[in-house]
């Protein structure tokens, strides 16, 4: 089974709130009423009978804030931020090093970072 949820309340988001004085833009009530991190999603999967076998993430979009690309305060920067993420994804595919991208995402997930929490799990029998 594949499960992907937003990775909100992660360290890089908290840093953006504190250092850049940005609002907690990831809070979206009533759209999102439950928030997960790697630990809480893993616990849920185990509780309902699944064994997590692999975890990973997606591009850490909030890292762009640390590089001076503020897509939160400047809404016009949103599409450009998205394009930067897409360019990063396509770069690794273009040079036939997709495995490097997967290793980067795995490492980010090991640090609790990345835009999403992704688990591949199998049903415990």
Where are these regions (language model features)?
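Conserved SAM-binding loop
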Residues: 1-20, 30-50, 118-125
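A generic short-segment signal for beta-strand/edge and adjacent turn/coil regions
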Residues: 2-4, 21-23, 85-92
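Extended hydrophobic-aromatic, low-complexity segments
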Residues: 11-15, 54-55, 64-65
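Short, hinge-like loop/turn segments at secondary-structure boundaries
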Residues: 18-22, 71-74
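Glycine-rich FAD cofactor-binding loop and adjacent beta-loop-alpha segment at the N-terminus
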Residues: 25-28
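A SAM-dependent methyltransferase catalytic signature shared across enzymes that methylate proteins
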Residues: 38-58, 90-97
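A C-terminal cap/extension of S-adenosyl-L-methionine-dependent methyltransferases
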Residues: 57-125
């Amino acid at each position: 089974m594949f499960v992907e949820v937003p990775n909100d309340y992660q360290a890089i988001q908290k840093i953006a709130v504190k250092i850049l004085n940005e609002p907690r833009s990831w809070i979206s009530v009533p759209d999102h009423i439950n928030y997960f991190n790697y630990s809480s999603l893993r616990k849920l999967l185990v509780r309902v009978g699944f064994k997590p076998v692999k975890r990973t993430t997606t591009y850490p979009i909030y890292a762009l804030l640390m590089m001076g690309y503020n897509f939160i305060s400047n809404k016009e920067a949103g599409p450009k931020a998205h394009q930067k993420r897409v360019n990063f994804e396509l770069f690794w595919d273009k040079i036939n090093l997709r495995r490097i991208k997967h290793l980067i995402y795995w490492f980010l997930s090991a640090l609790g970072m990345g835009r999403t929490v992704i688990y591949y799990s199998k049903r415990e029998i």
